[in-house]
From Swiss-Prot:
Xref: Gene3D superfamilies: 1.50.10.20, 2.20.130.20, 2.40.50.120, 2.60.120.1540, 2.60.40.1930, 2.60.40.1940, 6.20.50.160, Alpha-macroglobulin, receptor-binding domain
Record keywords: Complement alternate pathway, Complement pathway, Disulfide bond, Immunity, Inflammatory response, Innate immunity, Secreted, Signal, Thioester bond
The encoding gene: C3
A Pfam family per the record: ANATO
Record location of the Isoglutamyl cysteine thioester (Cys-Gln) cross-link: 999-1002
Protein purpose: Precursor of non-enzymatic components of the classical, alternative, lectin and GZMK complement pathways, which consist in a cascade of proteins that leads to phagocytosis and breakdown of pathogens and signaling that strengthens the adaptive immune system.
Residues passing through the membrane, by range: none
InterPro entries recorded: A-macroglobulin_rcpt-bd, A-macroglobulin_rcpt-bd_sf, A2M/Complement_sys, A2M_N_BRD, Alpha-macroglob_thiol-ester_cl, Alpha-macroglobulin_TED, Anaphylatoxin/fibulin, Anaphylatoxin_comp_syst
Description of post-translational modifications: C3 precursor is first processed by the removal of 4 Arg residues, forming two chains, beta and alpha, linked by a disulfide bond. During activation of the complement systems, the alpha chain is cleaved into C3a and C3b by the C3 convertase: C3b stays linked to the beta chain, while C3a is released in the plasma. The alpha chain is cleaved by the serine protease complement C2b component of the C3 convertase to generate C3a and C3b following activation by the classical, lectin and GZMK complement systems. Phosphorylated by FAM20C in the extracellular medium.
Name of this chain's protein: Complement C3
PROSITE patterns: ALPHA_2_MACROGLOBULIN, ANAPHYLATOXIN_1, ANAPHYLATOXIN_2, NTR
Region (Properdin-binding): 1412-1444
Region forming the signal peptide: 1-22
Length: 1651
């Protein structure tokens, strides 16, 4: 930049030779030149008619040693004495690696002409876009994508593109080069994947600074079968009105048919971030023929909120749960963002120049919105002062023409709505101030370009008006207007419009071509004499359409009809010749889940429009400002020069009609106008420019050298516009939740079952190579077979023409269905050995009733009513135009993907259907993650520059047998360099800035969050993320808390909850600490107050040995954090030391004994330090000692850690965060930076944003520690690491090279083996290796151990009459009893109840519990979000510690659910979240359980016929030998029944094997008693008696190997006969039977089975 400045000075000194006869020569170029791109420039001669040749050069800057481009052009009268040569800057000649801006010199020389202009360069050589096949994926699925690349002329390019995939945490997990014209392999998501929004980022290989991002979500989901749409009667709730609020409900199946069912509707109000439901609004609404309507009555709203005016500024929401008539499927939709307002409109100024020409018309574009930001149509508006009226169009805009007076320098403008139904005080109003255009040298010459048309589209002829005003002499010199049209950052066209003498208005017609999409700038100027230029410009929006053509339609009328699954059909593509067309067909159910990320023409134009280098909506401060703001660089032969551009991107481009741009344009103009001084206004405007480095306002202000006044104006405007931007980032509140069951359709009887149900398919690329027709359009027919889904497919085509850019066609829909079909509903996954109910819904869309037979096909992977030997069938009628749900109960026995198949046929007809789908079965147990973080730092931790280590495998003693272990090893370079800024988002701290209230303790609890949030945001410079105006509010809250705390300050400067209580050492120290921190932010906090508390602590609570004592514990023990536990003396002393140290900078001069007090206390702590037991106390003490400069050895501290990254105690999350924060502070104070990285990473990974009650200390410490880290941590070194990972059973190690350029890309390797592996690292810098081990752990017996609460939950059936039932089908009474297990009653306590699916709480019961004089509960809230189950939250003022507190209320079942998951009840302390207990409840479903037999984690289905004790009279010896010697029979025994036990619903018969008649798998059958397992239901049929002998044999498949033994299953294939004892064999009745048994034994024992 220094060279740049010298060059400009030299240029000004040398000057440029002008024409000898008074001509004016101009050179105009784009303000930014793109490399490797042809750019048009303009050279013009005014007042010179002599033909001449001009040489055009492009040189390097500043030395001009290289000629990068050269050409010659002829200028003559035939060309109106202007030329538009094309130049091109080759990137290969430049230093691309330079991090500084690069410029070139554009030079024009010729007779009497010498012009030069320095122009900024950009390496953006084109546009690149990514299309993914859909916008949402499940773990493990492939992400198909294609890349489209065009240059700035919208011509197709096949340059190599780098495509990266980034996790929601911003980690690059894949980066590879792709060729846009070639085949691209999909990116396969791993099974172990981060849920959330992922990014696919595309950028050119040689210009990575410009990128395009496609987004997609990753989560577990199933597709719905129908969608629900809500349409409120108004977009707002007008507070003064008396009308009820109506919401229309529309429900449609995805194949177009209307849904019959019922909707449950509840309204609520969202206040800040909290949803407050209106219990009385819960209504059951029938959905008839797909439609219903919900109503919120004003009285219902007042029943929840008595003063409706308090709701102004908040939003209404409505949650609707629609359940189909069969109860088989459910979709939840929520519509939010319905603003509660006093005025229903807001006004913005958009597409309005900031500058006006005095005495000329000023075109003011007003944009009126509803409160949700949507355009408000047909609203009258009026401007005051200069009167003008208009009415908004359908897009919310109205154009007002203001006739401005002469001789004014500023124009105050006020516009208000003029709606006839609103009183004046309720009308919306908006003001701005426009500034007068400054003429050159005060000449008073003006040009106003006016375009009055509103919606402009290709093919239009656009009238452009040139209005001039000036003195007569000047006007007589105007012979023509030169105009330039800029599009996509390039000069698209240059022309001249003649003017005749005396014309003050000249009009030309401009033909709009597709090349001018999406918008263009029209810049015009005229010259007066040889030195004055008068200019104006206007920005023009063009309707978003394709530049070319692309249409998708059915190849014939037959193809446009409703199709059958699997049918053949054809589509026809029509488009530009040579276009490559990418196709994809997507199930519309995917868009019900997520349609945010679909590629569209509008999104493409939005991206391309960013290449516009113009920065305003038109006009300019003066003639040069017109060119600058339009994105042009100008120089003239009379030294008229635009300012040098220093950034390619505009601080605020004039986006098209969008609310965010409206807000910013309007806000910037009005804010800057507040500064009358031109210099300060410039400082303000610069403050509102966006910083490309992302610096904070404060950091940017450090670079200002123009004085304090400029710096103050800069900061004020910078903070102001940041707050506006934050408001504009409000996300849409309309979202759709999904059913818990999948949406695709399955098969039937003897027909091949439908089994192909992709979410997207037809991923093809077709080229239009056919001969074009007379309209220049090529076509191609594409044949294909439809998939098996019954749905509507949306076929999306994106074409890339060689010359006309990208075109996204209107989607073509293909509806697939038939009159009779099955919809098989499967969950996303089920747990092995757990029963689940699935449903097949049979639809009959025929006009006649039918009779059907349905069958569940047997699969040995499931236990079901369908068995190998017996098919499970049901037969029933289905009425015309209706459906019927058929439930099937199954128990999955094997993990993995297994087929579920249902078939159905119609009696007497050929109609049938079959569906086969995969069901994912996951292992039992609790999915556990073990994370180990290892820092690789070979220069510090290595030997000879190499760090080698062996990573020991985790001990997984609790792993579920026969389940896989997945280990993922990720390596990331220098992970801590920017971790705070990237991971702790300041915008999420909004909830911490609250109003303090309550007693001396509660006030500190509620004041602390504002203090620590301000401390953290100040330290990290993140106020922009939260909104700069929030800092003022935070300071106000701090001062409120400070003032209130003074009420509880005693005369001796100590504190207690109330002044009549004894003073608390801990509370006084805490007040000292918080006020000391706050005093750095608020100067009004008295140092005397802080130091008074310090003095009281030292003189009244410190013992001679240095320890601090507590004589009066606080009431709110939860605010103590971890200090509340064991080792109280050490933790209290350490805590008070940290408070004294915090106050040292304030009180050291006032309190002479402060340092000696700290020394005494730290002497005591040093004696205790190595003997401490708790990790928390060790961390706290280490910080106190390190902060006092008494500790520099971290060995004891690190020994107390878990994994060297956290200080952890069981079941105490907030204490662990607090303790780890103390440890981080200690490490920072000791400057042990090598140990810091993993600790910071762990804290960040907790995603902990703090809270108030019960979280005070964790909140304070985590943000204090992270802020301190941001301040202290030295900048990271250059990175150049080579890492090798040798995994077991792999011969070749994984090798990675990590440097600064690729540090953020994660290198990941996975293995299924949980074994030791070795790692080697060498080089410079640091990297973090994260080992994530995921496995299924057996549930611990104490998994539900409760902390500080006892809880009992039960349900019982309730008989109700018709009135009491309230439309429900049944009811239960939920009984909850809890007791606090502390020494005193628990104060504020919350009971959070998760409802059973299909059940709603009885609001009247809850009201009775809360409204009576004997109030059992403080208040309750109901959230009937059926997607996540409804919830009831109950607030209790206290819970007794001496007796149970019980609550009973009814819950009503409103619809049937096939398999009800348990509900849960959680009780927890409002003040301490670690004190909690959770229990589950479920209606009794014992008789509905399928029978299965389990040993360990292996289960066998037992849902078959019982084995019957063989008592047939006609069984002879030969039959027994034949049966015993059958192929699959494994053994034949004589046994004695020793005992019978019952376990898990099964009978276990312990048999002693007396004789092995035929040996089998069990080689030691007689070693000990053998277990025979049978279902309980077979007990009576078997009728086995103790001490009786039995002949028994069974199949090999009925043997069950155990760890050191074998068990035997008794199934229908087991043969059992009673063997009479010796005495009975003497009886005539049993003699023949005993002889047969003896002969059977001898035959098989001696001779074996006959062959």
């Amino acid at each position: 930049m220094e060279g740049m400045a010298l060059y400009l000075v030299a240029a000004l000194l040398i000057g440029f030779p002008g024409s000898s006869h008074g001509a004016l020569y101009t050179l105009i170029t784009p303000a930014v030149l793109r490399t490797d791109t042809e750019e048009q420039i303009l050279v013009e001669a005014h007042g010179d008619s002599t033909p001449k040749s001009l040489d055009i050069f492009v040189h390097d800057f500043p030395r001009k040693q290289k000629t990068l481009f050269q050409s010659r052009v002829d200028m003559n009268q035939a060309g109106s004495m202007f030329v538009t040569p094309t130049i091109k800057v080759p990137a290969k000649e430049l230093n691309k690696d330079s991090k500084q801006n690069q410029y070139v010199v554009v030079k024009v020389t010729g007779p009497q002409v010498a012009l030069e202009k320095v122009v900024l360069l950009s390496y953006q050589s084109g546009f690149v876009f990514i299309q993914t096949d859909k916008g949402i994926y499940t773990p493990g699925s492939p992400v198909r994508y294609r890349v489209f690349s065009v240059d700035h002329n919208m011509h197709r390019m096949d340059k190599t593109v780098i495509v990266e995939f980034q996790t929601p945490e911003g980690i690059v997990v894949s980066s590879k080069p792709v060729n846009p014209s070639g085949s691209i392999r999909p990116y396969n998501l791993p099974e172990l994947v981060s849920f959330g929004t992922w990014k696919a980022v595309a950028k050119y290989e040689h210009s990575p600074e410009e990128s395009y991002t496609a987004y997609f979500d990753v989560r577990e989901y199933v597709l719905p079968s129908f969608e629900v749409r809500l349409q409120p009667s108004d977009k707002f709730l007008y507070i003064d009105g008396n009308k009820n609020f109506h919401v229309s409900i529309t429900a449609r199946y995805l194949y177009g048919k209307k849904v019959e069912g019922v909707a449950f509707v509840v309204f609520g109000v969202k206040i800040d971030d909290a949803k407050k439901s209106i219990p009385d609004s819960l209504t059951r609404i029938p959905i008839i023929d797909g439609d219903g309507e919900a109503t919120l009555k004003r009285d219902t709203l007042r029943s929840r909120f008595q003063d409706l005016n308090q709701l102004v500024g908040h939003t209404l929401y409505v949650s609707v749960t629609v359940i189909t008539e069969s109860g088989s499927d459910m979709v939840v939709t929520e519509q939010g963002g319905i603003h509660i307002v006093t005025s229903p409109y807001q006004i913005y100024f958009t597409k309005t120049p900031k500058y006006f020409k005095p005495g000329m018309p000023y075109e003011l574009t007003v944009y009126v919105t509803n409160p949700d930001g949507s355009p408000a149509a047909h609203v009258p508006v009026v401007s005051e002062a200069i009167h003008s009226e208009g009415t908004t169009l359908s897009d919310g805009t109205a154009k007002l023409i203001l006739n401005t007076p002469l001789n004014i320098q500023s124009l105050p403008i006020t516009v208000r709505t003029n709606h006839g139904d609103l009183p004046r005080e309720r009308q919306a109003i908006k003001s701005m101030t426009a500034t007068a255009y400054q003429t050159q040298g005060g000449s008073e010459n003006y040009l106003h370009v006016a375009i009055t048309s509103t919606e402009i589209k290709p093919g239009d002829n656009l009238p452009v008006n040139f209005n001039v005003r000036g003195n007569a002499n000047s006007l007589n010199q105007i012979k023509y207007f030169t105009y330039l049209i800029l599009n996509k950052g390039k000069i698209f066209k240059v022309g001249r419009q003649p003017r005749r003498d005396g014309q003050n208005l000249v009009t030309m017609n401009l033909h709009i071509t597709p090349d001018l999409i999406p918008s263009f700038r029209f810049v015009a100027y005229y010259q007066v004499g040889n030195n004055e230029i008068v200019a104006d410009s206007v920005w023009v929006d063009v309707k978003d359409t394709c530049m070319g053509t692309l249409v998708v339609k059915g190849a014939s009328s037959r193809d446009d009809r409703i199709q059958k699954p699997g049918a053949a059909m054809k589509i026809k593509l029509e488009g530009d010749p040579g276009a490559r067309v990418g196709l994809v067909a997507v199930d519309k159910a995917v868009y019900v889940l997520n349609d945010k990320y679909k590629i569209s023409q509008a999104k493409i134009w939005d991206t391309i429009e960013k290449s516009d280098f113009g920065c305003t909506a038109g006009s300019g401060q003066n003639n040069l400002g017109v060119f600058e703001d339009a994105g042009l660089a100008l120089t003239t032969s009379t030294n008229l020069n635009t300012k040098q551009r220093s950034a390619a991107k505009c601080p605020q481009p004039a986006n098209r009609r969008r609310r965010s741009s409206v807000l910013l344009l309007d806000s910037k103009a009005s804010k800057a106008a507040q500064f009358q001084d031109q210099g300060l206004r410039k400082c303000c405007e610069d403050g509102m420019h966006e910083n490309p480095m992302g610096y904070t306002c404060e950091k940017r202000a450090k670079y200002i050298q123009e004085g304090d006044a400029c710096k103050a104006a800069f900061l004020e405007c910078c903070h102001y516009i940041k707050g506006i931007r934050d408001e504009n980032q409000r996300e849409s509140e309309l979202f759709l939740a999904r059913s818990d069951f999948e949406d695709e359709l399955f098969g039937d009887d003897n027909i091949i079952s439908r089994s192909d149900f992709p979410e997207s398919w037809l991923w093809l690329t077709e080229e239009l190579t056919g001969e074009p027709n007379n309209q220049g359009i090529s076509s191609k027919t594409v044949p294909f077979y439809l998939r098996d889904s019954i749905t509507t497919w949306e076929l999306l085509a994106v074409g890339l023409s060689p010359t006309k850019g990208i075109c996204v066609a209107e989607p073509y829909e293909i509806t697939v269905m038939k009159d009779f079909f099955i919809d098989l509903r499967l969950p996303y996954s089920v747990v092995k050995n757990e029963q689940v109910e699935i449903r097949a819904i049979l639809y009959n869309y025929a006009d006649e009733d039918i009779y059907v037979r349905v069958e569940l096909i047997y699969n040995p992977a499931f236990c079901s009513a369908s068995t190998e030997g017996q098919r499970y069938r049901q037969q029933f009628p289905i009425k015309a135009l209706s459906s019927r749900a058929v439930p099937f109960v199954i128990v999955p026995l094997e993990q993995g993907l297994h087929d579920v198949e249902v078939i159905a046929s119609v009696r007497g007809e050929l109609a049938s259907d079959g569906v086969r789908k995969k069901l994912k079965v996951v292992p039992e147990g609790e999915r556990k993650n073990i994370v180990t973080i290892i820092e690789l730092d070979p220069s510090v931790k290595g030997v000879g520059g190499t760090q080698e280590l062996t990573v020991i495998a985790n001990k997984l003693d609790d792993k579920v047998p026969d389940t896989e272990v997945e280990t993922r090893i990720s390596v990331l370079g220098d992970p801590v360099a920017q971790i705070i800024e990237n991971s702790i988002d300041g915008s999420k701290l909004n909830h911490l800035i609250i109003t303090p209230s309550g007693c001396g303790e509660q006030n500190m609890i509620t004041m602390t969050p504002s203090v620590i949030a301000t401390y953290y945001l100040d330290a990290t410079g993140q106020w922009e993320n939260l909104g700069v105006d929030r800092r003022t509010e935070a300071i106000k809250q701090i001062m409120t808390g400070y003032a209130q705390q003074m009420v509880y300050k005693k005369a001796d400067h100590s504190y207690a909850a109330f002044t009549n209580r004894a003073s608390s050492s801990w509370l006084t120290a805490y007040v000292v600490k918080v006020l000391a921190m706050a005093s750095n932010m608020v100067k009004d906090i008295s140092h005397e107050i802080i130091c008074g508390g310090v003095k009281w602590l030292i003189l009244n609570r410190q013992q001679p040995d240095g320890v601090f004592k507590e004589n009066a514990p606080v009431i709110h023990g939860e605010m103590l954090g971890g200090t509340k536990g064991a080792e109280p003396e050490a933790s209290l002393t350490a805590f008070i030391v940290t408070a004294l140290l915090e106050s040292r900078s304030v009180c050291k001069e006032q309190i002479n004994i402060l340092d000696s007090s700290i020394n005494k206390a730290t002497d005591y702590l040093l004696k205790k330090y190595e003997k401490l037991q708790r990790p928390y106390t060790t961390a706290l003490t280490a910080y106190a000692l390190a902060a006092a400069d008494r500790l520099n050895d971290d060995r004891v501290l690190m020994a107390a850690s878990t994994g060297r990254n956290r200080w952890e105690e069981y079941n105490a999350r907030t204490h662990n965060i607090e303790g780890t924060s103390y440890a981080l502070l200690a490490l920072l104070k000791m400057k042990k930076f090598a140990e810091v990285g993993p600790v910071v990473r762990w804290l960040i990974d907790q995603k902990y944003y703090g809270g108030t009650y019960g979280q005070t200390q964790a909140t304070v410490m985590v943000f204090q520690a992270l802020a301190e880290y941001e301040i202290q941590m030295p900048t990271h070194q250059d990175l150049n690491l080579d890492i090798s990972i040798k995994l077991p059973e792999r011969e070749v190690p994984e090798r990675y090279s990590i440097n600064d350029r690729n540090a953020v890309q994660a290198r990941t390797v996975e293995t299924k083996l949980n074994e030791d592996f070795t790692v080697s690292a060498s080089g410079d810098g640091k990297a973090t290796m994260t080992i994530l081990t995921v496995y299924n752990a057996q549930l611990r017996e104490d998994a539900n151990v409760c902390n500080k609460f006892h809880l009992d939950v039960s349900v019982e059936n309730v008989e109700l009459n018709l009135k009491q039932a309230k439309g429900g089908k049944a009811a239960l009474r939920l009984k909850i009893c809890t007791r606090y297990l502390g020494e005193v009653d628990s104060t504020m306590t919350i009971i959070d109840i998760s409802m059973l699916t299909g059940f709603f709480p009885d609001a009247e019961d809850l009201k009775r519990l809360s409204n009576g004089v004997d109030r059992y509960i403080s208040k309750f809230e109901i959230d009937n979000n059926m997607a996540q189950k409804g919830t009831v939250v109950i607030y209790l003022d206290k819970v007794s510690h001496s007796e149970d507190e019980c609550l009973h209320f009814k819950i009503h079942k409103h619809f049937e659910v096939g398999f009800i998951q348990p509900g849960s009840v959680k009780v927890y302390s409002y003040y301490n979240l670690d004190e909690q207990c959770t229990k589950f409840y479920h209606p009794d479903k014992e008789t509905g359980l399928l029978n299965k037999i389990c040993h360990g984690n292996i289960c066998r289905c037992a849902e078959e016929t019982c084995s019957l004790l063989n008592q047939q009279k006609k069984i002879d010896l030969q039959l027994r030998i034949q049966k015993a010697c059958a192929q699959n029979v494994d053994y034949v025994y004589k046994t004695k029944l020793l005992r019978i036990e019952e376990k898990d619903g099964n009978d276990i018969y312990f048999m002693d094997v007396l004789e092995v008649i035929k040996g089998g798998t069990d080689r030691n059958a007689q070693a000990k008693a053998r277990q025979y397992v049978s279902q309980r239901k077979c007990q009576e049929a078997l009728n086995l008696k103790l001490d009786n002998d039995y002949l028994i044999w069974g199949l090999s498949s009925d043997l069950w190997p155990m760890k050191d033994d074998i068990s035997y299953l008794i199934t229908k294939n087991t043969w059992i006969e009673r063997w009479p004892n010796e005495d009975e064999c003497q009886d005539e009745e049993f003699q023949n039977l005993c002889d047969d048994f003896a002969q059977l034994s001898n035959t098989l024992t001696i001779f074996g089975c006959p062959t």
